[in-house]
């Protein structure tokens, strides 16, 4: 044991501060405090080898217990997913679509939607109409058609450029935007037919008159 009484108060306080002990009091109190601390530390270090072996032997047992617990926990966790997979298989059976009229009806609707022609925008219709009219105008100028027809085509081009295509017009029918209507016979056609009928009637009357005249002469 060190001779603390030969040390100064400053040295004793330094030792006490290093050991985290109180530095208050007289020199004798400081010396007694250091001696007591040495005895306590010596008593802790004097542990029998048998006690150390017992402590070391008990530690692996304590360590082995958590290992066995981890193994059992892993087994329980691995068994849980099997239970959760069963409802998924049941859901697969439930989600299978049933074959029937509804399935065929939806397929027919999809096929009809895919085959339907896309609707043209007004600008696309205008471009298509101008292309057709310009071709007609070029053809009319090339083959020397009447100036009235050429002027009519030019007016149609100007009208389409300003107002677009009228869906009720003949031009819309030529472009295939609307179905062709069964137009009734115009008044001129009726007049021509009536004229033909009248001409046929006159020819019959004249033939009858000629026949009668020839009979009188005989």
Curated annotation (Swiss-Prot):
Keyword Phosphoprotein: yes
Domain of life: Eukaryota
Cellular-component GO terms for this entry: nucleus
Gene3D superfamilies, per the entry: SAP domain (1.10.720.30)
Signal sequence, start to end: none
BP GO terms, sorted: poly(A)+ mRNA export from nucleus; protein-RNA complex assembly; transcription elongation by RNA polymerase II
Function: Facilitates RNA binding of SUB2 and likely plays a role in mRNA export. Suppressor of the transcriptional defect of HPR1 by overexpression.
Protein's UniProt name: Protein THO1
Upper lineage: Eukaryota, Fungi, Dikarya, Ascomycota, Saccharomycotina
């Amino acid at each position: 044991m060190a001779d603390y009484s030969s040390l100064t108060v400053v040295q004793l306080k330094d030792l006490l501060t290093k050991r985290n002990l109180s530095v208050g009091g007289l020199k004798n109190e400081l010396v007694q405090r250091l001696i007591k601390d040495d005895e306590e530390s010596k008593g802790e270090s004097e542990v029998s080898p048998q006690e150390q072996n017992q402590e070391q032997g008990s530690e692996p047992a304590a360590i082995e217990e958590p290992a066995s617990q981890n193994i059992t926990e892993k087994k329980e966790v691995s068994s849980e997913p099997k239970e959760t997979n069963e409802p998924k298989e049941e859901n697969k059976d439930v989600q299978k679509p049933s074959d029937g009229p509804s399935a065929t009806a939806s397929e027919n609707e999809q096929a009809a939607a895919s085959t339907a022609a896309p609707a043209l925008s007004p600008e696309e219709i205008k471009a298509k109409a101008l292309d057709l009219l310009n071709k007609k105008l070029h053809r009319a100028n090339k083959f020397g058609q009447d100036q009235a027809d050429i002027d009519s085509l030019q007016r149609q081009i100007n009208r389409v450029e300003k107002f677009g295509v009228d869906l009720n017009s003949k031009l819309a029918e030529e472009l295939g935007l609307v179905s062709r209507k069964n137009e009734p016979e115009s008044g001129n056609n009726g007049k021509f037919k009536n004229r033909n009928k009248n001409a046929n009637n006159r020819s019959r009357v004249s033939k009858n008159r000629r026949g009668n005249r020839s009979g009188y002469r005989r």
